[in-house]
Amino acid sequence: MVALRLIPCLDVARGRVVKGINFVGLRDAGDPVELACRYSHAGADELVFLDIAASHEGRATLVDLVRRTAESVTIPFTVGGGISSVEGITELLRAGADKVSLNSSAVGRPELVREGAQRFGRQCIVVAIDARRRNSGTDGWDVYVKGGRENTGLDVVRWAQQVTELGAGEILLTSMDGDGTQAGYDLQLTRAVAAAVSVPVIASGGAGCLDHIAAALETGPEGGHASAALLASLLHDGVLTVEQIKADLLARGLKIRP
């Protein structure tokens, strides 16, 4: 069994790390490279940078941030936001990113997933899916884009299967209902997607305590079956540390790097 991963997420807007609740009410959470170094030294397995303003406002992801991070940390990191071409993927990987995350651009042009995977290998291509539970009384979740502002009408599970077939090497799955609430991951969502695809699924949105993180990674009937847990508010606000979380997961018998 591959070791489970803890991945701090740094949502970036205008060069600063920000955090909100349900994708709104953003507040400043610090300098991205500074936080990246802190989490790297603390034992995080990977990092994710998401430029949450780029897709919405049409700006390119800051390559400078990638370069500075690559010079400062030794763990793998993913960058996403505003990547709309193979040239954009190339620029970020050359600047030092290990993976790129595609979200709105994958929905707008699914071929980009295949092109990126063919050029760089599927291990470099992450597809980020922002999911919101349907309020129509129908079971399931819809895919949202443009920073959670636009409902595509796509079914999350079917979309995850489609991008995996196109070449995505990993799914970054965010519950918009849970994002920033610290009320727990949407385990039903994570479990449904993990069961439907053959690539790792990263659980994101809602971690509030140690039990929530463990539940997302557990593989029993009530577990989330995720391969990794994305963490933001819990770490940025100092509620828990990477060391505390890893010690707890190891004590529960989960396979994770110490």
Curated annotation (Swiss-Prot):
Its main location: cytoplasm. The keyword Cytoplasm applies. It comes from the Bacteria. Coiled coil: none annotated. Gene3D superfamilies: Aldolase class I. One of its GO terms (molecular function) is lyase activity. The active site is at residues 11, 130. The keyword Zinc does not apply. Pfam families: His_biosynth. Pathway: Amino-acid biosynthesis; L-histidine biosynthesis; L-histidine from 5-phospho-alpha-D-ribose 1-diphosphate: step 5/9. It is found in: Cytoplasm. One of its GO terms (cellular component) is cytoplasm. Its EC number is 4.3.2.10. It is an enzyme of class 4 (lyase). It catalyses: 5-[(5-phospho-1-deoxy-D-ribulos-1-ylimino)methylamino]-1-(5-phospho-beta-D-ribosyl)imidazole-4-carboxamide + L-glutamine = D-erythro-1-(imidazol-4-yl)glycerol 3-phosphate + 5-amino-1-(5-phospho-beta-D-ribosyl)imidazole-4-carboxamide + L-glutamate + H(+). Keywords: Amino-acid biosynthesis, Cytoplasm, Histidine biosynthesis, Lyase. GO terms for biological process: L-histidine biosynthetic process. IGPS catalyzes the conversion of PRFAR and glutamine to IGP, AICAR and glutamate. The HisF subunit catalyzes the cyclization activity that produces IGP and AICAR from PRFAR using the ammonia provided by the HisH subunit. Belongs to the HisA/HisF family. PANTHER family: IMIDAZOLE GLYCEROL PHOSPHATE SYNTHASE HISHF, IMIDAZOLE GLYCEROL PHOSPHATE SYNTHASE SUBUNIT HISF/H IGP SYNTHASE SUBUNIT HISF/H. This is Imidazole glycerol phosphate synthase subunit HisF.
